[in-house]
Amino acid sequence: MARFLLATQATPTISATDANPRTLGDSVSNNKNIASMDTHMVIILAALLCALICALGINSVLRCVLRCTRRFTPNEDPVDTNANVAKGIKKRALKVIPVDSYSPELKMKATECLICLGDFVEGETVRVLPKCNHGFHVKCIDTWLLSHSSCPTCRQSLLEHQTPANGSRRGDDVAT
């Protein structure tokens, strides 16, 4: 007699005449309930997926609208610190900042220019910023200050915000 590895025992089949009619009806109705529950679950998951996609779409549209409206609205505060840092200072204001000849006795916080990373050589002209006492090569710091109004090392603003008698604000004067 041959043996099969995955031999299964035959399950007795229930014929319609042997089975209780109530049991067959219950199993058919259970199958219908399970099928309708699966259908309802698929519909609910599809609705949730659609709601998520709609929410993400609305979020993207709102972010785009807010970004565009910020771009076109004028800045209400003319003395905004970020605007002043990006604005730079005028050439005539650069002349107010003192230029010295570098020597080891000069009271500067560093011995190299942090813009070009070059060491200071004795006798070289350097510009020392008045508020923070950081020193830089004249060409390096002048180029920087034409487009920025702060120290490149500590970001301290070099502009004085004075309110003249007429009430308008000026930010072109360099602190000395």
Swiss-Prot record:
Gene3D superfamilies for this protein: Zinc/RING finger domain, C3HC4 (zinc finger)
Keyword set, alphabetical order: Membrane, Metal-binding, Signal, Transferase, Transmembrane, Transmembrane helix, Ubl conjugation pathway, Zinc, Zinc-finger
A biological process from GO: stamen development
E.C. code: 2.3.2.27
Zinc finger (RING-type): 113-155
Pathway field: Protein modification; protein ubiquitination
TM stretches of this protein: 42-62
Protein's membrane topology: Single-pass membrane protein
Domain of life, source organism: Eukaryota
A Pfam match: zf-RING_2
Reactions the enzyme catalyzes: S-ubiquitinyl-[E2 ubiquitin-conjugating enzyme]-L-cysteine + [acceptor protein]-L-lysine = [E2 ubiquitin-conjugating enzyme]-L-cysteine + N(6)-ubiquitinyl-[acceptor protein]-L-lysine
SMART domains, per database record: RING
Signal peptide annotation: 1-16
Localization (cell): Membrane
Entries under InterPro entries matching the protein: ATL10/ATL72-79-like (IPR044602), Znf_RING (IPR001841), Znf_RING/FYVE/PHD (IPR013083)
GO CC annotations, alphabetized: membrane
Record comment regarding domains: The RING-type zinc finger domain mediates binding to an E2 ubiquitin-conjugating enzyme.
Family from the record: Belongs to the RING-type zinc finger family. ATL subfamily.
Protein name per UniProt: RING-H2 finger protein ATL73
Organism in which the protein naturally occurs: Arabidopsis thaliana
